[in-house]
A protein has these predicted regions:
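Positively charged, amphipathic and often flexible ligand-engagement surfaces
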Residues: 1-284
Length: 284
C-alpha cells in the first residue's frame, strides 16, 4: 500500500490509491471489534492497536504525498470497525480537501443514514468527506451470516431498492458538494447517465475535480471511453495480485449487479463487431 501511494504521488495518470483493511488484520479480530460481542484479550488489544497504527500510517502517507486514498469496503461483520477508523482519518486528514475516502456499499439499507451522519460530522468538525459509492459485493454471504447469527438482514430487499438507494446517495452527495468529494464506481449505464446529466443540470464543469466516474479495467470500456470523450473525469479501477487471489474479486464484481450480465453480452457483441470490422479492413 505504501508503494502504491508513493507511486501515485505526482502521477497525473493515477487519480487514487486504494487499500483493503482486512489484508492487514485477521478476520476474526476485525469481526470481534466490529460486532462488540466479546471483550478483547490483552493480545487482541495489542494486535488491534497495531492495525490502527498501520491504517493511520497509510492515511498519513497519502496526506503527505497529496494522494487520494480509498478505503475499500468489507463484509458487514467487519464494516463498523472500518467505518470508525475511516471517519477518524477523514476528520484528521481531510481538512482542506478529501484525501481519505470511505466506501459505501449501497445494497445495505443503513448506508443512507450513515451518509447523512458523515455530512453532519463534516459540517461540525470542518472537513471534506470523501465517499466512494458501489452497489455491493457480498450479498449472499451477508444474508447467510445474518440468518445464522439471528440478526436482521442488512441488505436491501431487491435490486430495485438497491438501485434507488444508490441513486439517492449520489443525488444527496451532489446536493452537498461543499462538504463532499465523490467517486462513483459502477458498470450500470443508467447510473452513469444520471450522474452525467446531474453534473450538467447543476451547471458544474464536466471535469470538476470533486467528481469521478469509475469502472474496472477491462469492463464497460464503452461507458468509460464515452464519458471521457464527453469531458467527464473517468478512472479505471485496477485490482492487482496473484491470479488465485484476484480472480474471486473479479467474479464478485461481475455478480454484484445483475444488470452486468446484459451489459456483458452487449460488450461481447461490440467486440465481435469491431473484430469483424478490422477483418474487413485487412481483407480490403
Amino acid at each position: 500500500t505504501i508503494r502504491s501511494i508513493d507511486f501515485a504521488m505526482g502521477n497525473d495518470n493515477l487519480a487514487y490509491a486504494v487499500f483493503k483493511p482486512s489484508t492487514i488484520i485477521t478476520d476474526e479480530l476485525l469481526a470481534k471489534v466490529s460486532e462488540k460481542r466479546e471483550e478483547l484479550t490483552i493480545e487482541e488489544v495489542k494486535a488491534y492497536r497495531e492495525f490502527k497504527e498501520r491504517f493511520m500510517a497509510f492515511c498519513q502517507r497519502a496526506y503527505d504525498n497529496d494522494v487520494r486514498l480509498i478505503v475499500d469496503a468489507e463484509d458487514y461483520c467487519f464494516q463498523d470497525a472500518i467505518d470508525t477508523l475511516t471517519d477518524e482519518a477523514m476528520r484528521r486528514y481531510n481538512k482542506k480537501r478529501a484525501i481519505v475516502f470511505a466506501t459505501l456499499q449501497m445494497y445495505r439499507h443503513d448506508r443512507m443514514p450513515y451518509l447523512r451522519r458523515i455530512l453532519d460530522d463534516a459540517k461540525e468538525k470542518g472537513y471534506i468527506a470523501g465517499v466512494k459509492f458501489v452497489r455491493g459485493a457480498y450479498m449472499e454471504a451477508e444474508r447467510a451470516r445474518a440468518a445464522a447469527l439471528g440478526y436482521p438482514d442488512p441488505i436491501c430487499k431487491n435490486k430495485q431498492a438497491t438501485d434507488e438507494n444508490f441513486d439517492e446517495a449520489v443525488r444527496f452527495t451532489m446536493d452537498h458538494l461543499d462538504r463532499f468529494e465523490m467517486f462513483m464506481g459502477t458498470h450500470n449505464e443508467e447510473s452513469n447517465y444520471k450522474l452525467a446529466k446531474l453534473i450538467d443540470e447543476k451547471g458544474l464543469k464536466r471535469d470538476d475535480s470533486r467528481i469521478f466516474f469509475a469502472q474496472l479495467l477491462g469492463m464497460s470500456d464503452n461507458i468509460s471511453f464515452n464519458l471521457a470523450h464527453e469531458g467527464y473525469n473517468v478512472t479505471k479501477y485496477v485490482p492487482y495480485a496473484k491470479v488465485r487471489d484476484v480472480l474471486p474479486y473479479l467474479i464478485r464484481r461481475a455478480e454484484e449487479n445483475t444488470s452486468v450480465a446484459g451489459q456483458t453480452s452487449r460488450e461481447l457483441r461490440m467486440l465481435k463487431s469491431e473484430l469483424d470490422r478490422r477483418k474487413r479492413g485487412v481483407s480490403n
